[in-house]
């Protein structure tokens, strides 16, 4: 990656991206080859590996820009990854595009887009006062009940 990182930083990024359990099951751990002819990873595992690399690359940056970084990750891991992001990047600006509305409560400020235009903005509570967002939230909540 061209970025010098310590073993501790790698371990932290692995935990933040929720790859630690997978890596602990691999015979060679972090030394496992995941290139062609290496270990086969699922889409979510590949995405979490990319996130871990991104966390390491962003360690000295003031901004963390994410574009649906967890779109292939299950909802429980996704929520934990975002908790880890907000906990470990407290002093950074985190900008993230998400489609999972359940994550919105975690953000300080939200821009809601429709057809490439901002149709609402504010905190989660601000958005709940917007009729369009309220309908969207209600439908999303109903569809995603466990």
Language-model-detected regions and their locations in the chain:
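Conserved H-loop
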Residues: 91-99
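ABC-fold ATPase nucleotide-binding domain signature/coupling loops
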Residues: 20-49, 53-55, 61-62, 66-69, ...
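Catalytic "switch" loops of ABC-type ATPases
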Residues: 2, 99-100
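C-terminal portion of ABC ATPase nucleotide-binding domains
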Residues: 25, 83, 100, 105-146
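ABC ATPase nucleotide-binding domain helical subdomain, centered on the C-loop/LSGGQ "ABC signature"
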Residues: 1-36, 83, 91
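Conserved D-loop-proximal element of ABC-family nucleotide-binding domains
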Residues: 43, 74-79, 121
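Helical segment within the ABC ATPase nucleotide-binding domain
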Residues: 78-90, 102
């Amino acid at each position: 990656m061209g970025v010098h990182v310590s073993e501790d930083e790698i371990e932290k990024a692995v935990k933040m991206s929720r790859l630690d359990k997978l890596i602990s099951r691999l015979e060679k751990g972090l030394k496992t080859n995941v290139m062609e002819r290496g270990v086969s990873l699922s889409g979510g595992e590949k995405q979490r590996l990319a996130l871990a690399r991104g966390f390491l690359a962003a360690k000295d940056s003031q901004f963390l820009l994410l574009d649906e970084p967890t779109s292939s990750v299950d909802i429980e891991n996704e929520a934990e990854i975002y908790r880890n992001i907000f906990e470990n990047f407290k002093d950074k600006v985190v900008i993230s595009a998400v489609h999972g509305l359940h994550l919105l409560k975690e953000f300080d400020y939200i821009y809601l887009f429709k057809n490439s235009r901002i149709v609402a903005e504010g905190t989660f509570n601000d958005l709940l006062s917007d009729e369009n967002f309220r309908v969207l939230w209600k439908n999303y909540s109903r569809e995603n009940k466990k």
